Amino acid sequence: MSFKKVFPAVLVVTLALSGCSAVKNLLPSKESTNFLNGTNAKNGPVLVVKIDDTTQAHPQIGLEDADVVYIEQVEGGLTRLAAVFSSVIPQRIGPVRSARISDIDIVSQYGRVAFAYSGAQRKFLPVIEAANLEDLGAQHEGSSIYTTDPNRTPPYAMVLRADLLMKKISDRNLVIDTAKDIGFVFSDKNDGGVPTDKAVMHWPAATYSANWSESEKRWLLSHNNQPDIAESGVHLGPTTLVIQMVSITPSEYKDKLGGVTPLSHTIGSGKAYVLRNGELFAGSWNRTSAESGTTFAMPNGDPINFAAGQVWIALTDREPDFTSRPSNNSK
């Protein structure tokens, strides 16, 4: 059963009983266009879930319903995902893994979000508690919400019952912001692109590739040279793929094996590549503060328009590779 079907009824009952203004923040706004994906969908409360991205964690659960997915570097040069849900919140999401320091700045531009994760380094927990988010980590919730999938092997078996978590948020009258403008501009087209078939993104111990599908009008992903297929059987792939070039530096935190946690710097400015509709747009990104959104612009200052639909943002400090094609075969 999906959140989209259950949640409004829960809200009606809760509001009738409590009349609490905090709960009203969980009501999807009346906007006809979702700020995060540009489609004709409501702007619901924002849930961010940390998801394991190792080979053992695949196939992942629920990512096909995310509005935005961030790929971030973690210890050992591996990647981990931060999935942002608003328009639709699926029943199950996972496998859930622990939070990292890069998450704080990534999620702050969304306002006060519901933040779901498996745990964190003890030294880092006070930072999460002090951040402008609702800390809903597994250490605070029961096993009925952070479940164990019997068909998976720990630590790749924790699966979030997102529907139950959102009901608990309503029952507790917690304040969660609905989706808002975070800098994305959506349009049917964007001029000045280079026809492109494929992009390859690099991290020290992981790779992603994206191949343009003319029939599906999206970039079909592969993870470590294997098709990125969700548990549902859906081939994961966004309509807009952003490669955001960032500085990645060692942080003061370490994992339980002593590996230094990298910090991806997402406040500031830098180079960006945006892929949509089978074309590549080279430009820049800019973000002035933790609370402000991230904008993407062409060299002349015009915004780079995203295509309506799911957005993936790869945070990396390594230049990607692109395979272009003759312009008369584009789109």
Predicted regions located by residue number:
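C-terminal motif of bacterial Sec signal peptides marking the signal peptidase cleavage site
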Residues: L17-G19
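Bacterial signal peptide processing site
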Residues: S21-K24
